[in-house]
A protein has these predicted regions:
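Conserved substrate/cofactor phosphate-moiety recognition/catalytic segment
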Residues: 17-73, 114-116, 174
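Acidic, Mg2+-coordinating phosphoryl-transfer loop and its flanking beta/alpha structural elements
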Residues: 254, 262-293
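Conserved GTP-binding G-domain of TRAFAC-class P-loop NTPases and closely related GTPase folds
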Residues: 3-9, 100, 107-160, 274-276
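Short, acidic loop-to-helix structural element flanking the phosphoryl-transfer center
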Residues: 178-208, 216-220, 248
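Asp-based phosphoryl-transfer active-site loop
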Residues: 160-174
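ATP-binding Walker
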Residues: 14
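ATP-dependent NMP and nucleoside kinases share a basic, alpha-helical "lid"
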Residues: 39-43, 81-125
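Substrate-recognition "cap/lid" segment bordering the active-site pocket of phosphatases
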Residues: 215-263
Length: 293
């Protein structure tokens, strides 16, 4: 069995420590910069913040190289890793020591509200300020995208496009429940969003209807779009029986079906988490409802 170095990627409150502790209980060893900061507070008081951070980073690398050279089966790097450069550095280091690097993205990082709640439930001296967590959440979205598209060759002449959501954006539930997929044909059309879609279509944009609806209602959704004469070019939905969060699914669909071929000029959505995703990917995003769910 190959020796593994697990590179954890996630924001505060995303479950990195929980996962690390599970791995350690199974025999892994680890490094963690926060613990090194706590252990070397005397250096901070003596040298100041900038020199202290450099010291901690160097100390972690020394500890990590020592653990790798000792030949442990599983070595965990328990840090946020919110830059592609940092992730790739540890991938190279793992290879140098004969390890297989496994980059683990903590999916709870997509759920800022949950991470914020966990963060504030910690002892006061361990709180990360909310504005810092928000900034880290945006960086997580960026690095997740960069990592999963680093080998993608983007077409030079990508077609300009818009991405538009279904539920709560182009379509609205009237009497059905949110998971009554067999009744999506009963939804009403949002006339304002409809006019926006028609405008962008008339100006030469490809219209990509991108929905986190369960794939079981793909045909019903197509029928609804056709019945309401929505001028779309492609309907992209998640697979059947996929219960993951909208923001995770939208990221995956964008990477798989859109990024390489289309230059998205505008995204239209209602859910705040998804709008934050589009903005983190440097798209103009029109948020058409509060979407705090």
């Amino acid at each position: 069995m190959s020796k593994t170095m697990k590179v954890l990627v996630g924001i505060p409150g995303s479950g990195k420590t929980t996962l690390r502790n599970q791995l350690v209980a199974a025999g892994a060893v680890y490094t963690n910069m926060d613990e090194l900061r706590q252990a070397h507070q005397a250096v901070l008081k003596k040298e100041g913040r900038n020199k202290f951070e450099k010291f901690v980073a160097q100390k972690e690398q020394e500890d990590l190289k020592r653990l790798l050279s000792e030949g442990h089966e599983v070595v965990v790097v328990d840090d946020t890793h919110l830059t592609l450069k940092g992730i790739e550095h540890h991938e190279r280091l793992a290879k140098d020591y004969g390890y297989v690097a496994e980059v683990v993205f903590l999916e709870d990082s997509f759920n800022f509200a949950m991470c914020h709640k966990r963060n504030t439930s910690r002892p006061v001296d361990q709180h990360v300020p909310v504005y810092v967590v928000e900034e880290m959440a945006e960086r997580f979205l960026k690095v997740h995208f960069q990592y999963h598209t680093r080998d993608v060759v983007v077409k030079k002449d990508r077609q300009k496009a818009i991405v538009v959501d279904m539920d709560g954006t182009l379509a609205h539930m009237v009497s059905r429940g949110p998971f009554e997929w067999h009744r999506v044909g009963e939804d009403t059309l949002d006339e304002v969003v409809y006019e926006l879609v028609k405008f962008y279509k008339s100006t030469g944009h490809t219209v990509l209807v991108t929905s986190a609806r369960d794939g079981v209602c793909y045909e019903q959704t197509k029928e609804w779009l056709d019945r309401h004469a929505v001028p779309y070019d492609m309907l992209i939905m998640k697979p059947e029986n996929d219960s993951r969060k909208d923001v995770i699914v939208k990221m995956e669909l964008y990477v798989k079906y859109i990024h390489q071929k289309y230059d998205v000029k505008v995204a239209i959505d209602d859910r705040l988490q998804v709008c934050k995703l589009w903005r983190a990917l440097d798209m103009k995003c029109l948020q058409v409802n509060h979407g705090l769910y």
